[in-house]
A protein has these predicted regions:
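Double-stranded beta-helix
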Residues: 2-6, 106-131
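Glycine- and acidic-residue-biased ligand/ion/polar-headgroup-sensing regions
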Residues: 42-43, 61-78
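Short acidic-glycine-tyrosine-enriched beta hairpin
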Residues: 79-100
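Short, surface-exposed beta-strand-loop junctions and turns on beta-sheet-rich folds
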Residues: 55-56, 81-83, 120-122
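Conserved short histidine dyad/triad with adjacent acidic residue
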Residues: 38-60
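Short beta-strand His + acidic residue motifs that chelate non-heme Fe in jelly-roll/DSBH
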Residues: 49, 75-76, 96-98, 103-109, ...
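A short, N-terminal "cap"/entry segment at the start of jelly-roll beta-barrel domains
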Residues: 1-40, 88
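Conserved hydrophobic/aromatic beta-strand scaffold that supports enzyme active sites
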Residues: 38-40, 49, 65, 87, ...
Length: 131
């Protein structure tokens, strides 16, 4: 599920967990700076050794991925002008990718655990603005 701003800019992507995956699901459009996929491997699959070559990229802002490992939370997404777009409930196994705009989350169950992955370097005093 893609979440767009009023100006048709991609703000976030949410993937709701499901057990049946045939092979690969690319969660991010190819043109986004943060790429994420879900990949199913069969037994004895071998990913050939490889190196990712140096490629210069320009990043503006921080992109984040949340993977809900347990519990439940409510994620709210905002336009860059701080206008609320929508809220979604995320449960165990769900993934949220934030490309731009604002966000917040509120835990709905005790012991909610997420993995948070973001591009860096993270500059604590300059990287976010609370509203």
């Amino acid at each position: 599920m893609y979440i767009y701003s009023q100006k048709k800019k991609l703000v976030a992507c949410i993937y709701k967990f499901r057990k049946k995956i045939n092979s690969r699901i690319n969660l991010s459009p190819e043109n986004e700076l943060l790429q994420a996929s879900i990949i199913k491997f069969d037994k004895n699959f071998n990913l050939n050794r490889h190196i990712h070559t140096k490629v210069s990229r320009k990043t503006i802002g921080t992109q984040e991925i949340w993977i809900v490992m347990g519990g439940k939370l409510k994620a709210t997404f905002y336009e860059t002008d701080k206008t609320k777009i929508c809220s979604k409930i995320l449960k165990k196994g769900d993934i949220s990718i934030l490309f731009r705009g604002g966000h917040k989350f509120e835990t709905l169950e005790k012991n909610t655990i997420i993995y948070e992955i973001k591009n860096g370097p993270y500059i604590k005093d300059k990287d976010l603005k609370k509203f």
